[in-house]
Structure formats: C-alpha cells, structure tokens
Regions:
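Glycine/charged-rich beta-loop-alpha catalytic/anionic-binding loops adjacent to active sites
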Residues: 2-3, 29-32, 80, 102-110
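Glycine-rich phosphate/diphosphate-binding loop of Rossmann-like nucleotide-binding domains
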Residues: 2-40
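C-terminal binding/interaction regions
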Residues: 8-15, 19, 95-166
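Short glycine/serine/threonine-rich phosphate/pyrophosphate-binding segments
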Residues: 13-17, 41-45, 64-73, 92-95, ...
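Acidic, glycine/proline-rich low-complexity segments that act as flexible tails and inter-domain linkers
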Residues: 31, 43, 66, 158-166
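N-terminal beta-loop-helix "entrance" segment that forms/cooperates
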Residues: 33-54
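Glycine-rich phosphate-binding loop
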Residues: 48-86
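Glycine/small-residue-rich loop that forms an oxyanion/phosphate-binding "nest" at active or ligand-binding sites
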Residues: 77-102, 106
Length: 166
C-alpha cells in the first residue's frame, strides 16, 4: 500500500499531527512521522523531501506554525500532493500560519486544511490514496457511515431527554 509522510517543524505540533496519524492507522495506511525544521536544519529537510518519492510516499502531510514554510517547501520539492496543516499560534491565532500555507505561488499548490486540522489532513490524504485503491475507498465509506451514526445517536438522545437535560 502507498505510504504517507507526516512531517512537523517542532514537537509542539505533535498533538495535532498525531490526529492525522490516528486517522491513517484507523484506515490501515502506512506512514512515517518526522520532526524536521525547514529553518534550523534545511539540509535534513531537503534530503527528506527529495527522497520521499523513492520511499514510496504518495502524499506528505506537513504541519507548521508562524512563518509555516514547511508545507510549501514540501510542495516545491515533492512531486506529489502536499497537505498543509496551519498550527494555532499565540500571537495571531494561527492566521499567520494559515496565510503562509494557503498563499502559494502559481504552480506550487498546497492543499490546506483548517487551523489545527490534523484529522482532516489524515482524511484528505486517505481520500487522495483511495482514488486508486478500492479497498481503502470502502474503508472511507464505512468511516463516513460511522460518523453519520454517531450524529443519529446524539439526535435520538436529544429528542428523548430534551436540550435542558442533554
């Protein structure tokens, strides 16, 4: 099966990036998770991005905060889809990260999820892979059905007890 790269600039991003890994694990998708700073160790980062294709990666999920160059640089070097996760920051609430990731120059696209959107990044990676994997597509459909059923259970409870006792 295809593999997904998960890369973050700092271990402080781990709580969010782990949500992407959790989704991939639930769906049976192999991944490799790394902490690499594009600013503090650019040589290590370039090697990672240049060798990702030969390692079997089909998608890279990159999370970053503040200047948030990691996702864009992955997209510039890695020839397949890059998904950016903007991290919440204390100074601007993650808007700085979001704008850095989403405002890419023409020809270097980064699929960008919500601020701290680790789970959706994992799901987007799975959906990309599922375009050529029928078994994975079936797992995604089952996952969507689980989400639907969770909402139905919550609504049934609301109807039974009312909003004041919910």
């Amino acid at each position: 099966m295809a593999k997904v790269g998960i890369v973050m600039g700092s271990d402080s991003d781990m709580p969010i990036m782990s949500k992407a890994a959790d989704i991939l694990e639930k769906l049976g998708i192999d991944y490799e998770m790394k902490i690499i700073s594009a600013h503090r160790e650019p040589d290590v980062f370039f090697e990672y991005a240049k060798t990702a294709e030969e390692k079997g990666f089909k998608v890279i999920i990159a999370g970053a905060g503040m200047a948030a160059h990691l996702p864009g640089m992955c997209a510039a070097i890695f020839p397949m889809p890059a998904i950016g996760i903007p991290m919440h920051t204390t100074s601007l609430g993650g808007r700085d990260s979001l704008y850095s990731i989403v405002q890419m120059p023409s020809g270097i696209p980064v699929a960008t999820v919500a601020i701290n959107g680790g789970a959706n990044a994992g799901l987007l990676a799975a959906k990309i892979l599922a375009t050529s994997d029928a078994e994975l597509l079936a797992k995604l459909k089952a996952y969507s059905q689980e989400l639907k059923e969770q909402v139905e259970v919550k609504d049934a409870r609301l109807q039974e007890v009312g909003y004041k006792n919910y």
